């Protein structure tokens, strides 16, 4: 059975690319046509590459590999958090902190500080501090939760990264490249498919498009994780 149907993708607007003047020529192989100054993405290729990404994630999850979802744009942030949480993956959906992967030991120390602040809040220790000091620490806690909450239980750098919008998340992409972490990316007609391992051409601005593609990738991880659990029993 197909991972996704053409009708599902059409309904979600996956086929709508950017204005043709804003394109990256490297995406030409994934463009079906141009209509009213907008590039239309070839959904047959989208379906094929989504299936490839699905199988890769399913098998990787069976092997116990860990996945990090990245999507910091407004349209993607909530979906990234929901779908990563649903399939037991990690996520970053606010600002990308430089060195998150390439300087992981420093980021780990910030994660530990986040955990410490959370423990102090839960125990009521923050309430015992002077109001001004408690307010400063609570602001720090809120900021750390936003930037690091989705990787709070990540023990080491991820085995695979899933990205929405390669162009926007290029700093994260470059860190993955340095560390040889495989990248799966939903990328629009203004992106560079050469810098990712499995490009999934599609509309990376529309909420329904992002939800459909990221949801399918989360399904793959869930399927692989269930197979792993069943095999262990």
Swiss-Prot record:
SUPFAM superfamilies (alphabetical): Ribosomal protein S2
Molecular function (Gene Ontology), one example: structural constituent of ribosome
Domain of life where this protein originates: Eukaryota
CDD domains reported for this sequence: RPS2
One GO CC annotation: cytosolic small ribosomal subunit
PROSITE patterns: RIBOSOMAL_S2_1, RIBOSOMAL_S2_2
Keyword set, alphabetical order: Cyanelle, Plastid, Ribonucleoprotein, Ribosomal protein
Tagged with keyword Ribonucleoprotein: yes
GO biological process per UniProt: translation
Compartment(s): Plastid, Cyanelle
PANTHER family named among the record's database cross-references: 30S RIBOSOMAL PROTEIN S2 PROKARYOTIC AND ORGANELLAR, SMALL RIBOSOMAL SUBUNIT PROTEIN US2M
Family: Belongs to the universal ribosomal protein uS2 family.
Record-given protein name: Small ribosomal subunit protein uS2c
